[in-house]
UniProtKB/Swiss-Prot annotation:
Function: Electrogenic sodium/bicarbonate cotransporter with a Na(+):HCO3(-) stoichiometry varying from 1:2 to 1:3. May regulate bicarbonate influx/efflux at the basolateral membrane of cells and regulate intracellular pH.
Sample GO molecular function, one term: monoatomic anion transmembrane transporter activity
Keywords for this protein: Cell membrane, Glycoprotein, Ion transport, Membrane, Sodium, Sodium transport, Symport, Transmembrane, Transmembrane helix, Transport
Ranges of Basic and acidic residues composition bias in the record: 376-389, 1007-1035
Entry comment describing in which tissues the protein is expressed: Expressed in kidney and to a lower extent in bladder, brain, intestine, large intestine and eye.
UniProt topological domain (Cytoplasmic) ranges: 1-421, 476, 527-540, 667-681, 764-775, 812-833, 875-916, 943-1035
Lineage: Eukaryota, Metazoa, Chordata, Craniata, Vertebrata
Cysteines paired by S-S bonds: none
GO cellular component, one term: basolateral plasma membrane
Source species of the chain: Ambystoma tigrinum (Eastern tiger salamander)
Record-given protein name: Electrogenic sodium bicarbonate cotransporter 1
Glycosylation site residues: N591, N596, N609, N617
UniProt-annotated location(s): Basolateral cell membrane; Cell membrane
């Protein structure tokens, strides 16, 4: 290995020695290492870049650069000063011509000629790498002395150049909108434009919004204006500066060029707009008359410094040739737009997602992520999980469980202090309301299905106990446990079976729970969770989409049921209000209109004065009863107005749809243009809570009697016929205890499928979880909690897909310092145990918060249900493909799979997924819903059968490739091919293999050498010079 490295270094040194001669006759453009069609050798520049970027280095990655372009300009007709005219982090921002503001960030458009001239500047100028200096005067002194020694600058020019480089610096700063009258007066008095071009072509500057500082006092500390600059929020803490100084002077006959990289980044006073240390300096001073050329060269070097690949090369370069090779690489990747088809003055908006530079870097650093000859499978980062460490079968007793514990134990402490964020509070409130609503809904349905043997209070207690324990000790604390539809169906069938056969329902259920928990523990001990690797995107998206559709369907179903209970009287007419009436009459018209008070007194208390007066006679007038009381005691409502319900349904739908719409709008508020970034992020984090508060307030303000949240106010079992502990023996024959193992097997399949599919969805690669999964540990705790819930006659709990996805979405983290114009990058999810634990503790305490919770309208919570269902469908590929069915091909988005898979195959795949989803929906809506988990398992078989209808190439883009037994063998073969294959950055877009050798293209630069560098040349000279084809007819 060392001999190969020495060989490469010798070759690079040979290139360095001949670099100047070569560069003066030709421009080597690296064609992504192997693009040339004329030669089969690797270009020296490409080898150089590969050596630079592929070098093993234990030092941290180079920091982010802030690049500032300062130009030498006359301000208000006064002395020449350095004026900041543009800046870069990722995108270019210019000072607008009015001088009042910065432009919007935009993609820097450069002229190809300025890039060529920049390359020549690096060739001919002074290059000082790893210079040890602590101040700007010291840097300037070293640079000037170096130029004098090399004969590039006359000694008598030293004083003039030094004085020019140490002139005042003015930075563009933002001022408050609330300015004083004096400031306004100054602005009016200096109405000249920022770039007004006089006869000599030298721009002059206005005096507005400028901060001026002289560096003659050699102050290395940032001034107050720098420290107050809010632009620092856009930069990471370890950011460094790259300063570009360009301008024209009247005392130079040839350009003064220098590129400096300091050994250590140094604070150079107020040289930079923001108080960050300077690492790079590029200086270009030239004769008068070419200010525009200097400006464009300055923009070119500044843009290169913001390019990730050249940025790394600039930090690692060891000599001039390394920098030239970096420019050549940039020129190879640059795109040229025809002048007649594009206006260069148009500012290109930054893209929503930036292309990754990893492909360019790996192309030279020899990364493992390269595709060779197009035979590597597709992986877009969200692919399969067959190679996941958590799903490797150990072959030992409880081996997977032990590994899960070892993997999660080091993070246990951090799982608590990582929750210290305001975002955690918003997640707690959001998930709490969703969990409470879910507990009440399923508790009510469970009470109806089991004649209140399990009800709302049991649902609250079971949710609190199971959820809190799981979040504290489970393998994936981001997973939220809840009751599910299949469990509810099983409970209903089990209760009816027990009732028909005179079995003790709770005892029978206890034994089923014990058997199921035992079977789950067997699955844990045998590492059965490795089967999860066969759950591909097809299965996961089918399951998650179905649950999301159920949430959406149930939300509308509940609202329609509410509309039936509070019907709209469409025949009501305001003009006929005098004719509308409603009265309560006794059940038997033959009797007196008086009713025995003693019957009523045992069940209700009348609050009217009239009833109190009549209590002495022991009777009450029927006409004084309310509608509910009248119906309760068998009375008759007579009148045309008895069915009129004022505005409840309409108001409920307003609250329902309003909560959903407001939640969606506020959640997207983070990317809006209103308010500062911090305010937008805060509003987005608390979107659901704000929506609930807004519409709860609206409901209270209007005073319409909409149905409210009903929470149990007493801590006791719903049914008086049961306690908090179920005795295991005595209620059923002995053989029932053994027979319970058969239905328990069905429950085990249900629990295993629900838990593991939700776990797979939560742990997908696109969520960027860093603390690892714990499939075996999750199933272990679900089994233990099933035992506890069975003994306490509480509902069984398993991972809830939609609420878990909502929990993850509420904890997503993005970069706090994103460059202007750059979309915040998704960093991952705030992995911790606090939010889930607090949510479930609050759920248990909700019994004592009934006086507060009773003010929340149910339609508002149904709106939250709708939001959770719709939000969990975002980013699901199945939904994207479903929309393609309604789009003409020319309007379809540029999805990666549409580039590689024929559209008819995409539609066929979607159609099969829709058919499977429809069958699952029909199944869950019938009595056969008890075998729902088995049908989910059948999706894996359906996906396996697709291998006979779709090629592996198509499935690699539309789905995940199912793991194979001989995968390791195939990977070894692939690595052998990689050693023999060629590297191509565009191989993924082409099915044609490229030559094995790596060529280069050399474009002669004689035309540019014929022109004097950066000084006037006559048009006639250029016209008489031979063209490229004339001098190279052999080509």
């Amino acid at each position: 290995m060392s001999s190969e490295k020495e060989c490469l270094e010798n070759m690079l040194n040979g290139y360095a020695e001949s670099g100047r001669v070569l560069s003066r006759t030709s421009l080597v453009i690296n064609q992504a290492v192997n693009r040339s069609i004329f030669t089969s050798t690797v270009s020296p520049a490409a080898e150089r870049i590969r050596f630079i970027l592929g070098e093993e280095d234990d030092s941290p990655a180079p920091p982010q650069l802030f690049t500032e372009l300062d130009e030498l300009l006359a301000v208000d007709g006064q002395e020449m000063e350095w004026k900041e005219t543009a800046r870069w982090i990722k995108f270019e921002e210019k000072v607008e011509q009015g001088g009042e503001r910065w432009s919007k960030p935009h993609v820097a458009t450069l002229s190809l000629h300025s890039l060529f001239e920049l390359r020549t500047c690096i060739e001919k100028g002074t290059i000082l790498l790893d210079l040890e200096a602590t101040s700007l005067p010291q840097i300037v002194e070293i640079v000037i002395n170096n130029q004098i020694e090399l004969g590039l600058l006359k000694a008598d020019m030293k004083e003039n150049v030094t004085r020019t480089l140490l002139r005042k610096h003015r930075h563009q700063t933002k001022k408050s909108n609330l300015r004083s009258l004096a400031d306004i007066g100054k602005t009016v008095s200096s109405a000249s434009r920022l770039f007004s071009t006089p006869d000599n072509g030298s721009p002059t500057m206005t005096h507005r919004n400028l901060t001026s500082t002289s560096l003659n006092d050699v102050s290395d500390k940032p001034d107050k204006e720098q420290l107050k600059n809010k632009f620092m929020k856009k930069l990471p803490r370890d950011a460094e500066a790259s300063n570009v100084l360009v301008g024209e002077v009247d005392f130079l006959e040839s350009p003064f060029i220098a590129f400096v990289r300091l050994q250590q980044a140094v604070m150079l006073g107020s040289l930079t707009e923001v108080p960050v240390p300077t690492r790079f300096l590029f200086i270009l001073l030239g004769p008068k008359g070419k200010a525009k050329s200097y400006h464009e060269i300055g923009r070119s070097i500044a843009t290169l410094m913001s390019d990730e690949v050249f940025h790394d090369i600039a930090y690692k370069a060891k000599n001039r040739e390394d920098l030239i090779a970096g420019i050549d690489e940039f020129l190879d990747e640059v795109i040229v737009l025809p002048l007649g088809e594009w206006d260069p003055t148009i500012r290109i908006e930054p893209p929503k997602s930036l292309p990754s530079s990893d492909k360019r870097k790996n192309m030279y650093s020899g990364g493992d992520n390269l595709q060779m000859n197009g035979d590597a499978p597709h992986d877009d980062g969200g692919g399969g999980h067959g190679d996941s460490e958590e799903l490797q079968r150990t072959g030992r007793f409880c081996g997977g469980l032990i590994k899960d514990i070892q993997r999660k134990a080091p993070f246990f402490a951090s799982d608590f202090y990582d929750a210290l964020s305001i975002q955690s509070l918003s997640a707690i409130l959001f998930i709490y309301l969703g969990t409470v609503t879910n507990a009440i809904t399923f508790g009510g349905l469970l009470g109806d299905a089991t004649e209140n043997m399990q009800g709302v209070l049991e649902s609250f207690l079971g949710t609190a106990v199971s959820g809190a324990v799981f979040c504290l000790f489970g393998g994936q604390p981001l997973t939220i446990l809840s009751s599910t539809g299949p469990v509810l169906v099983f409970e209903r069938l089990l209760f009816n079976f027990s009732k028909d056969n005179d079995f003790d329902y709770l005892e029978f259920r206890l034994w089923i729970g014990l058997w199921s928990a035992f079977q789950c523990l067997i699955l844990v001990a045998t590492d059965a969770s490795f089967l999860v690797k066969y759950f591909t995107r097809f299965t996961e998206e089918g399951f998650s989409s179905l649950i999301s559709f159920i949430f959406i369907y149930d939300a509308f179903k509940k609202m329609i049921k509410l509309a039936d209970y509070y019907p709209i009287n469409s025949h009501f007419k305001v003009d006929y209000i005098t004719q509308y009436s409603c009265a309560c009459f006794p059940p038997e018209p033959a009797n007196s209109s008086w009713f025995n008070m003693t019957t009523a007194a045992t069940t209700t208390q009348f609050l009217t004065n009239a009833s109190t007066d009549m209590a002495y006679n022991g009777t009450i007038d029927w006409s004084l009863l309310s509608k509910k009381e009248c119906l309760k005691y068998g009375g008759l409502l007579v009148g045309s107005n008895c069915k009129y319900v004022p505005d409840i349904t309409l108001m409920s739908f307003i609250l329902f749809l309003g909560t959903y719409t407001c939640s969606m709008a506020l959640k997207k508020f983070k990317t809006s243009r209103y308010f500062p970034t911090t305010a937008r992020k805060l509003i987005s984090d608390f979107a659901i809570i704000l929506s609930i508060l807004i519409f709860c307030g609206l409901d209270a303000l209007l005073g319409v009697d909409t149905p409210k949240l009903i929470v149990p106010s007493e801590f006791k079992p719903t049914s008086p016929n049961r306690g908090w502990f179920v005795p295991p023996f005595g209620g059923n024959p002995w053989w029932v205890y053994l027979a319970a193992a058969i239905p328990a097997l069905l429950v085990t399949i249900l629990i295993f499928m629900d838990q593991q599919i939700t776990g797979v969805i939560v742990n997908r690669k696109e969520h960027k979880l860093k603390k690892g999964a714990g499939y075996h540990l999750d199933l272990f705790w679900v089994a233990i909690l099933m035992v506890v819930c069975s003994f306490m006659a509480l509902p069984w709990y398993v991972a809830a897909t939609v609420i878990s996805i909502a929990h993850i979405d509420s904890l997503k983290m993005e970069t706090e310092t994103s460059a202007p114009g750059e979309q915040p990058k998704f960093l991952g999810v705030r992995e911790q145990r606090v939010t889930g634990t607090v949510v479930f503790l609050l759920t248990g305490l909700s019994v004592f918060m009934a006086p507060i919770l009773k003010f929340i309208p149910m339609p508002v919570l149904y709106g939250v249900f709708l939001y959770m269902g719709v939000a969990s469908l975002n980013g699901v590929q199945f939904m994207d493909r479903l929309k393609l069915l309604l789009m003409p091909p020319k309007y379809q988005p540029d999805f990666i799979y549409l580039r590689h898979v024929p559209l008819r195959r995409v539609h066929l795949f979607t159609f099969l997924q829709v058919v499977c989803l429809a069958m699952l929906w029909i199944l869950k809506s019938t009595v056969a819903a008890i075998i729902f988990p088995v049908m989910i398992l059948a999706l894996v078989a359906v996906r396996k059968a697709m291998d006979y209808f779709f090629s592996q190439h198509d499935l690699s883009f539309l789905d995940d490739v199912i793991p194979e037994k001989d995968k390791k063998k195939k990977e070894d073969e692939k690595k052998k091919k990689k050693k023999k294959g060629s590297i191509d950055s565009d191989v993924e877009d082409s099915d044609c293999p490229y030559p094995e050798k790596v060529p280069s293209i050399k474009i002669p630069m004689d035309i540019m050498e014929k022109e004097p560098f950066l000084i006037d040349s006559k048009p006639s000279d250029r016209e008489n010079s031979p063209t490229f084809l004339e001098r190279h007819t052999s080509c």
